[in-house]
């Protein structure tokens, strides 16, 4: 292989590694301590609720995981826009599933949360598929 090709390959591997690290951090929502607090209350986290509902989470796709990335730093951040949006099968029917992430500011909405919810609704309407909301928020 050419030197140029090897450089590009290495650069892409580095970028993919960085993306995977960011996604892993985003999947922690408001952090390990908040996730544990939710579990101690006897509740499932937003991601656990979605995984439980969807027939096969391995064939589902998350929409907008990077929403809110590096936004709202003064407020402590807003991973995934404070809401999980997945497309997957529920009882063998393709659906959009939206779940408030209570680990992010107790499920409070940020402007990016509203945009992400609207996008989820647009996707459901444009594709004529059901949308399911799993709500867990302080108000």
What are these regions (language model features)?
Residues 1-139:
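Terminal-region recognition feature
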């Amino acid at each position: 292989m050419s030197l140029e090709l090897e450089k590009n390959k290495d650069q892409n591997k580095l970028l993919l590694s960085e993306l995977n690290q960011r996604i892993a951090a985003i999947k922690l929502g408001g952090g390990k301590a908040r996730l544990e607090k939710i579990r101690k209350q006897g509740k499932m986290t937003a991601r656990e609720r979605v995984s439980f509902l969807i027939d096969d989470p391995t064939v589902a796709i998350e929409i907008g995981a990077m929403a809110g990335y590096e936004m709202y730093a003064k407020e402590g951040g807003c991973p995934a826009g404070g809401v999980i949006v997945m497309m997957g099968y529920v009882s063998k029917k393709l659906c959009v599933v939206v779940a408030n992430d209570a680990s992010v500011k107790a499920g409070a909405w940020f402007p990016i949360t509203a945009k992400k919810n609207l996008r989820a609704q647009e996707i459901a309407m444009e594709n004529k598929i059901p949308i399911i909301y799993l709500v867990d928020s302080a108000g």
